[in-house]
């Protein structure tokens, strides 16, 4: 049975459907020696030859693939791009290397935003999770600078007009702070560019800190350091797949217990290092005072 070319490539882990549509339109994809066009359909057979930028790529049936998902704690200062011409750090720099597949980011976070960013090897899963029609919840912890009153909160809940259309928070909950520096937890069901910041700016309030803490029911893992990643287990992966009406996986490549032990070992090493630094400074201080 034939399928759209971009769907086949996305499922095989060569990018999100949106990314693949762009490279097809740019004439970078060929099928059996002919330049592909957007809308072309292919049937996956052993003799099928698909090339991207002249390089022969693997297109295996989805049944042969194992969907993998990473939870990454993006720090501020990293770009959501594979390569930066200026050599700045990107979210892909620290991810584990793959053979025969690649990590696809589920959405984006702007350079000054930190927190949970999901990656998957399944382009179709990434595409569906990002699509606005799925209305997958994203939760953010936001520190704002400015006067926030009931009228502004009401506007943010009911909706304000942005340059790319109306927008609103699904929920807003005060979570601490005093004066003009306050924390709120907010949720959205779409991922427009800088939407959280633009919503607050629309009511005259600046965002001074922004952390994504949840995607769907997947929270930012406790104990995960900034720049660290952990791979989701089979139950969490299948939760995401079922959320967007994809068939569940029956096996996983992740050794979850090994991953948890690695996180725990890293925490212990950091604690030992801090203790050694404190002890050393105390001894040094004692000698100076003597």
UniProtKB/Swiss-Prot annotation:
Question: Top EC class per UniProt?
Answer: isomerase
Catalytic activity line of the entry: uridine(2605) in 23S rRNA = pseudouridine(2605) in 23S rRNA
Q: Where is this region: Disordered?
A: 251-290
Signal peptide from the UniProt entry = none
Q: What is its EC number?
A: 5.4.99.22
Task: Extract the SUPFAM superfamilies matched here.
Answer: Alpha-L RNA-binding motif, Pseudouridine synthase
* Keyword terms: Isomerase, RNA-binding, rRNA processing
Any Gene Ontology biological process: enzyme-directed rRNA pseudouridine synthesis
Question: Which residues constitute the catalytic centre?
Answer: 110 (nucleophile)
Q: Which residues form the S4 RNA-binding domain?
A: 3-75
- What GO annotations for molecular function exist for this entry? 23S rRNA pseudouridine(2605) synthase activity; RNA binding
| Pfam families, A to Z | PseudoU_synth_2, S4
InterPro entries in the record: PsdUridine_synth_cat_dom_sf, PsdUridine_synth_RsuA/RluA, PsdUridine_synth_RsuA/RluB/E/F, PsdUridine_synth_RsuA/RluB_CS, RsuA_PseudoU_synthase, S4_RNA-bd, S4_RNA-bd_sf
PROSITE patterns in alphabetical order: PSI_RSU, S4
Q: Which NCBIfam families match?
A: PRK10700.1, pseudouridine synthase
Q: Which family does it belong to?
A: Belongs to the pseudouridine synthase RsuA family.
Q: What does this protein do?
A: Responsible for synthesis of pseudouridine from uracil-2605 in 23S ribosomal RNA.
Full protein name: Ribosomal large subunit pseudouridine synthase B
What species was this sequence derived from?
Shigella flexneri
Q: Which gene encodes it?
A: rluB
């Amino acid at each position: 049975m034939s399928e759209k070319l971009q769907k086949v490539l996305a499922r095989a882990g060569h990018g999100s459907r949106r990314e693949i549509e762009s490279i097809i339109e740019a004439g970078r994809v060929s099928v059996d020696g002919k330049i592909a066009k957007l809308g072309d359909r292919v049937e996956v057979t052993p003799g099928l030859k698909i090339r991207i930028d002249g390089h022969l790529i693997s297109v295996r049936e989805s049944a042969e693939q194992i969907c993998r998902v990473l939870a990454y704690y993006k720090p501020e200062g990293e770009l959501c791009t594979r390569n930066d011409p200026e050599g700045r750090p990107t979210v892909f720099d620290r991810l584990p290397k793959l053979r025969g597949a690649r990590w696809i980011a589920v959405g984006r976070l702007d350079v000054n935003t930190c927190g949970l960013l999901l990656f998957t090897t399944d382009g179709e899963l990434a595409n569906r999770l990002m699509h606005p029609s799925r209305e997958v919840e994203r939760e953010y912890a936001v520190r704002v600078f400015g006067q926030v009153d009931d009228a502004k909160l009401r506007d943010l809940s009911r909706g304000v007009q942005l340059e790319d259309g109306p927008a609103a928070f699904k929920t807003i909950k005060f979570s601490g702070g005093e004066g003009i520096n306050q924390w709120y937890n907010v949720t959205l069901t779409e991922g427009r560019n800088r939407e959280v910041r633009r919503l607050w700016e629309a009511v005259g309030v600046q965002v001074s800190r922004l952390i994504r803490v949840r995607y769907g029911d997947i929270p930012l893992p406790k104990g995960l350091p900034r720049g660290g990643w952990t791979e989701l287990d089979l139950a969490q992966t299948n939760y995401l797949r079922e959320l967007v009406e994809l068939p569940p996986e029956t096996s996983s490549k992740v050794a979850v217990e090994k991953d948890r032990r690695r996180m725990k070992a890293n925490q212990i090493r950091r604690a030992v290092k801090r203790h050694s630094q404190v002890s050393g400074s105390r001894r040094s201080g004692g000698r100076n005072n003597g």
